[in-house]
């Protein structure tokens, strides 16, 4: 299987998992959940989660065991895009050919949706029972560093 085929296969797996992990848009608070889904399910190649899965397989693990972590990486990425698109940052109107979250839902809901995605990412990491607890803590620590001022924000 070539790279593009492998990426497409993994992308489908990630899309299905994200659909399961994201809260339904009808559950309270519906507008925030709608904005989360709009931003996450709005396209993208899912390269980051695919790399997480490939990395696990490269060291003898399974892609399935790291699927929650792979999705968490994607949620952190989308959170950063939502915040980056805001008027106070880059003030982008479009992302992946669609109106940005703040253009559809307003700035306040977009900020809350991004915050909720970041929180959900850490929830997925914390709830993953596939590995040893001490390894889970290391993953959470690395994700926090990567999403904070020593990573994305810095």
Segments from the language model and where they lie:
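Mg2+-dependent prenyl diphosphate-binding active-site environment of isoprenoid biosynthetic enzymes
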Residues: 9, 22-154
């Amino acid at each position: 299987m070539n790279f593009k085929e492998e990426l497409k296969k993994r992308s489908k797996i990630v899309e299905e998992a994200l659909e399961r992990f994201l809260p339904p848009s009808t559950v309270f608070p519906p507008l925030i959940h709608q904005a989360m889904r709009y931003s996450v399910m709005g396209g993208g190649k899912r390269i980051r989660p695919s790399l997480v899965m490939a990395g696990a397989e490269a060291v003898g693990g399974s892609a399935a065991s790291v699927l929650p972590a792979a999705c968490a990486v994607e949620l952190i990425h989308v959170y950063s895009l939502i915040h980056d698109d805001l008027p106070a940052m880059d003030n982008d109107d479009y992302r992946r050919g669609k109106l940005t979250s703040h253009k559809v839902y307003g700035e306040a809901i977009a900020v809350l949706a991004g915050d909720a995605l970041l929180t959900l990412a850490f929830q997925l990491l914390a709830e993953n029972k596939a590995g040893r607890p001490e390894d889970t803590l290391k993953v959470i620590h690395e994700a926090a560093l990567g999403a904070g001022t020593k990573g994305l924000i810095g």
